[in-house]
Amino acid sequence: PIATPDFFGANPEEARYAADLASVISNNFANSTPFKVVKKSAYLQTPAQLNQQGPVFPDWRGINADALLTGSVALTGDGQLKVEYRLYDTQSEQQLVGRRYTVDTRFWRHIAHRISDDIYQELTGEPGYFATRIVHIGETKGIEKGKGTMKKLCVMDQDSANYQCLTDGSSLVLSPRFNPNLQKIIYMSYANGLPRLYFLDMPTGQQTIIGDFEGLNSTPRFNAKGTKVAMTLTQGHEGNPEIYEMDMGSRTLKRLTYHRGIDTSPSYSPEGDKIVFNSDRGGQPALYTMNTDGSNVTRLTYGDGRYYAPAWSPRGDLIAFVKELRGVFHIGVIDPQGGEERLLTDSYMDDSPTWAPNGRVLVFSRQKSRSDISRLYTIDLTGYNLRELPTPTNATDPAWSPLIK
């Protein structure tokens, strides 16, 4: 258990930032499996007392807090926010980590997430995932601008804050993914009436077509370095979907699969030497792996049901997927070498799993019934801690960003 009292602020404005920072940090931990947040009503020291005299550790041990986070906030004359924090082990009465950040006041939420990541790393030994964003398709049903259903490219923080749409809905968009440096989003769009792959430049909002390939262009995925993109194309083979790879430097295209079955939804291993994909070449949709030159195609899943939408964990240890079994959709995980699969969810329609950058949490879309809208959810690898990420519209096709420094 961890205690997260409000940070200290010497005046009302600083105290407001101090309370807001602590609230974001506390919510991050409350929504993360390794942590249990001690209720603030049990705290025996105020932020001012903590700032003036430091922690009275027996008081914190008495409310079963193993870890204690304290901090302070100060505003500078040029609109900067100075944030200082300390994390203590209440049993040893020792400071575990402490740090000072200075940032423009506009970015106070980001600092709250950075502090959360610092503490997550210190207490679990693994990287955090709080200073991240989630891109997805925001879907508006009904009449807007004289149109029916509209699909927009939208992004938000991992806790649903700072929500914004990047496209106006005039063109259908699908399958968005961040590139590793967070400067671009790759996605499929019908901007000119044809399904083509585009980049959206995050700083400028400019959209650029990647390549005008004949037929269907879909499911683009970057490798971990951002130097290659795997995609599904139907060009030149009678409309049959195959996996291709594009070198982003030279823009050269290489075909990887050669089969009359439907091959789609590629996802790179973290090392970039293998790809997992979906194919019905065995009679029904299953998952396969191959080397990135197209060799050594190996079937991964043999269970009952149909498998879709594979996503290789950034840790390399698991592959997430969608499984449809007897009319029920599941999010599951499996070892890249095969073996026993684990199903984490079940619903009318669970779809599009992607990983947090630490490889320990998944985000996916869920439609609970035929008449329900689609929403975004996260779940950890235990299959517990399922939580909804609120969005103002229907939301599908999510993808997690890398950690934002």
Please place each PLM-identified region on the residue numbering.
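Short coil/turn segments that connect the beta-strands within blades of beta-propeller domains
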Residues: 132, 181-183, 225-227, 271-273, ...
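Short beta-strand->alpha-helix linker/helix-N-cap micro-motif
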Residues: 1-56, 69-75
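Blade-level signature of beta-propeller repeat domains, shared across WD40, Kelch, NHL, RCC1
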Residues: 374-405
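A short beta-strand motif characteristic of beta-propeller blades
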Residues: 162-167, 206-211, 252-257, 296-301, ...
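Short loop/turn segments that connect beta-strands within beta-propeller blades
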Residues: 91, 157-161, 201-205, 247-251, ...
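Amphipathic beta-strand/beta-sheet edge segments enriched in Tyr/Trp
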Residues: 51-118
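A flexible loop/linker signature enriched in serine peptidases of the S9 family
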Residues: 127, 139-152, 168-171, 188-197, ...
